[in-house]
Amino acid sequence: MVIGSEILSEKQMILIGILVVIFVVFAVLVNLLDNKSLNGIKAKKIGDGQHGTARWATKSEIKQTFIPLPFEPEKWRKGENLPAIQGTVIGCRGSGKKAVALVDDGDVHTLMIGAAGVGKTAYFLYPNLELACASGMSFLSTDTKGDVARNYGTIAKKYYGYNVSVLDLRNPTRSDENNILHLVNKYMDLYLQDKTNLSAKAKAEKYAKITAKTIINIGGGDSASYGQNAFFYDAAEGLLASVILLLAEFGDKNERHIVSVFKLIQDLLAKYQPAPKAKPKMYFTKLMDKLPSEHKAKWLAGAALNASDQSMLSVMSTALSRLNSFLDSELEQMLCFGTAIDAEKFCNEKSAIFIVLPEEDTSKYFMVSLLIQQLYREILVIADENGGKLKNRVMFYCDEFGTFPKIEGAEAMFSAGRSRKISIVAIIQFFAQLEQNYVKQGMEIITDNTQLTVFGGFAPNSQSAEVLSKALGEQTVLSGSVSCGKEKSQSLQMIGRPLMTVDELKSMPKGQFIVMKTGTHPMISKLKLFFKWGIKFEEEYCLPDKTARQVCYKNRDELIRDVEVKYPQKKAVAAEIEVSVDDEEFDEFPMRKAKIKT
């Protein structure tokens, strides 16, 4: 029985071997027979790039381009293994305690594109904020819902020792303070304490001009685009800087804010009569007359001061029209007191600024543009003082960049900020948002200056998918045709095929993104939800509701009186000046005696 079973097993083995051989032969025959069918033509990469050389980056190329960093927020928050790398997180490997982030540590701007609900905040922004806090980068973040401030305000302050400021435009009474004249006031005070400190005086004047320029450009454009009205806007800019300087010099501490500037200009528009029969004059002219001739405020207002009365009125009205946006009782609670974080503190200390903009109230959107513009321009001044770049990198995480109105000068921010260690991460839903706010030319400038592009998750009818499919380029693949007649014939040729077609982009799974960087081949990257990175949120960061504080304004008459006290004018003795005229001048036209009838 044992021998029989052994023989049976041998027969079974032989039978199995025969069946395997038959299967292999059958597969080979099917492949050969099907080779001249349409299914036999595979879109494999061939040729030498005749129709395109697009391809995905290899593993070795990815290692050379991006830095793998163990993502350990639990240890980081204890002050352990803090990363020395600063940059942008663009990918993830592993999860939880074994998560490894792919980080781009270059001085680059980033454009993040994804439809609503794709997880731009949960997959991309939160890991980047954690790395920013752990590596010590100061950052500004915009948010329409307020979730980012609530979730990361506590973490940044409690675990990483950040100065945190929440500028809540939805609830200004629950917002930190942000006096946009803070730096002007600060340096004017330093100069008034030490009149030999010309550097402080120059900085006060510089920040006054920056603030004035930012406010005048709220409505869009600059002097180059105003055409024939350029004079009025340029003169209004000088006038505004002049009043800001005077307010910083003569105003009390609680009076030096932007709403006081509005009130002063409006009061200075009024006219008075210097003498019973004299021509009425504006109080603005009276104020300027009281200043010494070498005072910078007088020089800045020179264009308006030396214009006709009608032109001067137009200039002052232009300035008032720009300041109208600040007339809001709630906004006054945020704008008319101190400043939680100014540009110098932002650059020199670990600081986080969260701007919450209300989706339901677009009238306050101008403040986002104003705050970002002013902060950026002030950072440029600090960078120039440090040899052209900042000591530590700062990040601007502009979530919903396509939702809030145009930021004047955004194109220049993308063009010039990178070399000064200012990195901008603009997060949008689709390209049409950029084109709507910045028109085609502005959109191209912004996209051309973003060296890193991350995108994924497109709506079924998205036009952005077509643009990005084209941007990925084409590869050379095999194509051909099969003719079925008496004898089957097959012709093969090379064609160009997109690296990823539009439908392939639209069907990408959630959490999968494509990363393109200047000078490298694109890569497919996976990002995970924040809790899979090991990120845990603490209690929400909330500011108490502040009671309405009384706002003080600088009075026109007080300002004129203060100027008179500080710069007393010597009364000039009226003297007649005799003008002698040579008789030769009248030889041609001799005077005639006139007879007067009485």
What is each of the regions a protein language model found here?
Residues V2-I3, S464-V467, A471, T520-M523:
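Short intrinsically disordered, low-complexity coil segments enriched in acidic
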Residues I62-F66, R77, F366, F401, ...:
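A short glycine-/small-residue-rich loop at the edge of a beta-strand within enzyme catalytic domains
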Residues V89-K97, A101-I422, N437-Y438, D503-I524, ...:
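P-loop NTPase motor domains
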Residues K528:
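Short, surface-exposed polybasic-aromatic patches that bind anionic ligands, especially phosphate groups
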Residues M1-V118, A122-E130, S135, T173, ...:
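Basic- and hydrophobic-enriched, low-structure N-terminal and domain-boundary segments
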Residues F414-I514:
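Conserved ATP-driven motor cores of ASCE-family P-loop NTPases powering translocation/secretion/packaging/pilus
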